[in-house]
Amino acid sequence: MDGFVQEWSNLPRSDNGLHMDQLVGELPTDGGFEPQTRARSNTWPCPRPENFVEPVDELDSTKASNQQLADPQQAMQNANAAKKNSSRRNAWGNLSYADLITHAIGSATDKRLTLSQIYEWMVQNVAYFKDKGDSNSSAGWKNSIRHNLSLHSRFMRVQNEGTGKSSWWMLNPDAKPGKSVRRRAASMETSRYEKRRGRAKKRVEALRQAGAVGLNDATPSPSSSVSEGLDHFPESPLHSGGFQLSPDFRQRASSNASSCGRLSPIRALDLEPDWGYSVDYQNTTMTQAQAQALDQLTGSMADELKLQNDMLQQQGFSAASGLPTQPPPPYQQQQQQQQQQAQQQSQLPQGYTLNGPVSAPGYNTLQPQAQQQQQQQQQQQQQQQQPQCLLHRSLNCGCLHSTRDGLSPNSVTTTMSPAYPNSEPSSDSLNTYSNSILLDAASDNGSLLVQQQQQQQQQQQQQQQQQQQLSSGLEGQCLEALNSEQIDEFNLENFQGGLECNVEELLQQEMIYDGLLDINIPLPAVNTNATNVILTNNSTNNSSSGCNISAGVQLSCSQLQAELQLQQQQQQQQQQQQQQQQQQQQQQQQLLLSNNNNNNNNSLELATQTATRVQYTQPSVVTSPPSWVH
């Protein structure tokens, strides 16, 4: 340890740091240990002089690139040498982990080794791993061996026959020779995948170009993308409907407010004209084909529109119940009605459009006439219908004769007697409703608005009157139906002699049902005539009907309940007493049985004793008196 007393010499520093050769030369060697230039855990190979490449200046590289080699064979040899020298080398040599494992398995007699045996072979046969067999320094290379065993296809794992032992590792005879194939999934970004994706792109572009050329020959229009989309989606309802899109239809994606690529079913009309010109609304009239197409597109919009009451009642609908009061007219009548409406529309002035009405003479006179015709048709239909009884469901009912004068036919037919409750409105009638309502809603004439307001007020008043008449008529009808001759069978006055019942039996039955046991109530002997209850209907006083009950048997509800509770308590006590008595009887029986058993056992013992007893008898000895006795 005396070497450490020496002072360190000041070594010259360079730009690259300290020179290791000078540092090693200055270290003292008498301390008993060799100087180590790097740690033992560093397993990277030492730099070799043949692999060292000197840096080439830019001028030298440019000069060498300008010169041509005289001998091409020499160039090939130099390239091969460079390849050999540039190959990856490990600290133990040129062999990789997979090659070492292959040698280890091949050197075994059975051509198979466990993982621990492979570790032992590495430590024994490879000089680099001799001092790295302990657990601290073997973590890295053992992990590499396990990784190579599971990674390469040349090794196969075989289950060990013994329980609790590690598996065998063997060489795979089916593995390809040469460089081992890695068991790693290939990437999706391969050349084959790129070719396939390129073909799909070309097909899509060809379809788009063909659709654009077929539909737009020379000039592109805003509907080119629409037609292209229809070609890609042949199941679209726009194909089968025969609906042709006008150039005014545009995609919503072209607007700044939306990015959806759907079609807008709204015409691109300039609702807000620019300041430079005025819009001619007369040129924007719609043809009949376009109107039908719009009806087809709207579809279920007719259900959401507020249909007028008079037009609903014309086809058999009622505003009060919401159900059709009569079946829809046959197809021929519907065609006739549609033709009449078309004629009425044709009589309108030509300047009328959906966007706005144009004042013309004669239009105000047509509307009241049409309304009068509709009202006449409604009255005729209501007169044809007949009221129906609610109780008997028959037209020729006797209970309706008295109320038929007080009730109007409108109130009976619109709400009470649905002749065909399961019928539904047809789609053609709804379409005609929607067309007529659109025409009525578009009219802005002042006189029409005044008339409509008056009609609505009148209709509301009529509805209120009808509802009042219905409520009063229904009450009268029900009362008269109850008091009619057809249900006189249920009149209590017709029962002669009254209704008789025995109160004692009734009370006993009720108590039996409540208490679930037969209870005999000690009641005094009462004449049956006095205990009979006679129920008669007092004709003079219709508001109340009484029952004459004898005074001796009148009991209030509270008294009955109290008596029932007492009886139930008595029953419970009796049941408990009975149970106690039964238990006592059982105990007595058990005692008797035990006593009988004891007696039987004693008698058996006595019998056996008498049977086995031996009777000993003394022999009778006759002694004669002595001779000297006389």
Swiss-Prot record:
One of its GO terms (molecular function) is RNA polymerase II cis-regulatory region sequence-specific DNA binding. Residues 332-350, 367-379 have a biased composition (Low complexity). GO terms for biological process: cell differentiation; glucose homeostasis; negative regulation of cell growth; negative regulation of cell population proliferation; negative regulation of insulin receptor signaling pathway; regulation of DNA-templated transcription; regulation of lipid metabolic process. Residues 92-198 bind DNA. It is found in: Cytoplasm; Nucleus. The keyword Nucleus applies. Residues 1-45, 214-260, 318-379, 403-432 are annotated as: Disordered. One of its GO terms (cellular component) is nucleus. Keywords: Activator, Cell cycle, Cytoplasm, Developmental protein, Differentiation, DNA-binding, Growth regulation, Nucleus, Phosphoprotein, Transcription, Transcription regulation. The modification Phosphoserine is found at residues 187, 255, 258-259, 264. The modification Phosphothreonine is found at residue 43. Residues 218-227, 408-417, 423-432 have a biased composition (Polar residues). Transcription factor involved in the regulation of the insulin signaling pathway. Consistently activates both the downstream target Thor\d4EBP and the feedback control target InR. Involved in negative regulation of the cell cycle, modulating cell growth and proliferation. In response to cellular stresses, such as nutrient deprivation or increased levels of reactive oxygen species, foxo is activated and inhibits growth through the action of target genes such as Thor. Interacts with melt. This is Forkhead box protein O.
